[in-house]
Design a protein with these regions (language model features):
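Phosphate-group recognition and catalysis centered on beta-loop-alpha active-site segments
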Residues: 1-259
């Protein structure tokens, strides 16, 4: 017996064009951060040259309001100093070299350099949410960008203000989908896809039952972040629609063995 919700929601009847890829797709995590230099133009070129269907990346905001491609809240991992990213202006950020070689790309530079590439973009902060979405909307990027976040608030903002953009599920929706797959809650999704780890808080999410449930709801399932061949093989056999990985070349090889 299902529990019911009083909230009226729509089922995802028509799949978003962003998701129009057959079989298991390769999401190069930060461009393939083990095989290349994460979140740089170099790593994105690497992923494109491999033929990856998608690039997963992140956006942070400079102190003067410019969206940049960057994951961490600070620069310690790259320059050994705990300078908060959003405390630095664009002039200061442009002087920094990642891996002693590469500039931190802006979102604009990324989208202009790779006009035919599909991106899965994680909005890292509330501050970057509005300027990033305003820019992506201004270049009509809804067919090649999916918005992701660990924040329900940010995803709700995208749903309300930019409904044409593909959106992955937030934490609350993922929990509802899991309960629905177990027959504990009725759930009709509003998002376009679900992107999950195998486990979260000790609960297994990437199960055959959840994947089948998502597919019945016309949702594609992407699993992160998978870097070993055995797990890739298991997920491909389970029927996931995409795998987010730091090793896109390895995943490409594993997918090839299934054809």
């Amino acid at each position: 017996m299902y529990f019911t919700s009083s909230i009226s929601v729509r089922i995802n009847v028509n799949m978003h064009s962003y998701l129009d890829n057959p079989a298991c797709s390769i999401f190069a995590h930060r461009g393939g951060s083990i095989e290349s230099y994460e979140n740089t133009i170099e790593s994105f070129n690497y992923a494109v040259d491999l033929g990856c269907e998608y690039i997963e990346t992140d956006v942070q905001l400079s102190s003067d309001g410019v969206p940049y491609i960057f994951h961490d809240d600070d620069l310690h991992r790259f320059i050994g100093k705990k300078l908060r990213f959003n405390d630095l202006n664009s002039n200061e950020l442009n002087e920094i070299k990642l891996f002693d070689r590469f500039s931190i790309p802006t979102l604009k530079e990324c989208m202009e350099t790779f006009p035919n590439t599909k991106f899965n973009i994680d909005l890292k902060t509330n501050e970057v949410m509005k300027p990033a979405m305003k820019y992506l909307h201004s270049i009509n990027a809804h067919s090649r960008v999916c918005i992701a976040s660990f924040s329900d608030q940010r995803l709700d903002f995208v749903k309300k203000n930019y409904p044409n953009f593909c959106r992955s599920m937030g934490p609350s929706e993922i929990l509802s989908l899991k309960l629905h797959s177990l027959g504990l809650k009725k759930f009709l999704p509003e998002a376009d896809c679900v992107q999950i780890p195998i486990y979260k808080y000790g609960i297994k999410l990437a199960t055959k039952k959840l994947i089948e449930t998502a597919h019945r709801l016309n949702l594609k399932v992407h699993v992160w972040t998978i870097n070993d061949a055995a797990t890739m093989d298991k997920l491909i056999n389970l029927g996931v629609d995409g795998i987010i990985t730091d090793k896109p070349n390895l995943l490409k090889e594993r997918i090839a063995t299934k054809k």
